[in-house]
């Protein structure tokens, strides 16, 4: 799932939360709901692990992260949020599960004993990912990204 979509959903839900903990929690939980839907990047991740060649995957993540910054930096700077602190916490909550999963998967410079402690979360994240996605296992990346961009545009339109 695009980081931009996780961030947008978390920020939007955080904006409607009544407390900082609720904003963060709603963003965090929204991550798993979104990950249940097929998004077409599954094969890139599997190919990256199988071949060790992650250039395409890293480019996608880099472009996605840049898009998220391009959207949210101006939104926060220009006062687009009524409750910016709650939106920010929701945004962080929406991104945190992927960050936690990236630690044991990609951060080999972290001591193994610390990575092992996160394996249960990694297994849970993969389980959530594979529930609905299994039905759409062969979805092309272009269709998955198009679906997410449409969803992001709908959220943006409804939020305005």
Segments and roles (model prediction):
Residues 1-160:
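N-terminal membrane-targeting hydrophobic helices
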């Amino acid at each position: 799932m695009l980081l931009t979509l996780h961030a947008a959903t978390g920020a939007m839900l955080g904006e409607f939360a009544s407390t900082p903990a609720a904003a963060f929690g709603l963003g965090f939980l929204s991550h798993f709901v979104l990950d249940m839907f097929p998004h077409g990047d599954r094969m890139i991740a599997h190919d990256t692990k199988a071949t060790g060649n992650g250039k395409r995957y890293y480019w996608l993540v880099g472009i996605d992260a840049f898009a998220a910054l391009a959207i949210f930096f101006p939104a926060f700077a220009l006062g687009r949020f009524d409750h910016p602190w709650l939106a920010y916490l929701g945004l962080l909550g929406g991104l945190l599960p992927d960050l936690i999963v990236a630690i044991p998967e990609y951060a080999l410079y972290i001591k193994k004993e610390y990575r092992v402690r996160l394996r249960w979360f990694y297994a849970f994240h993969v389980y959530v990912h594979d529930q609905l996605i299994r039905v759409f296992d062969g979805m092309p990346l272009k269709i998955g990204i198009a679906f997410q961009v449409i969803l992001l545009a709908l959220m943006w339109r409804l939020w305005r």
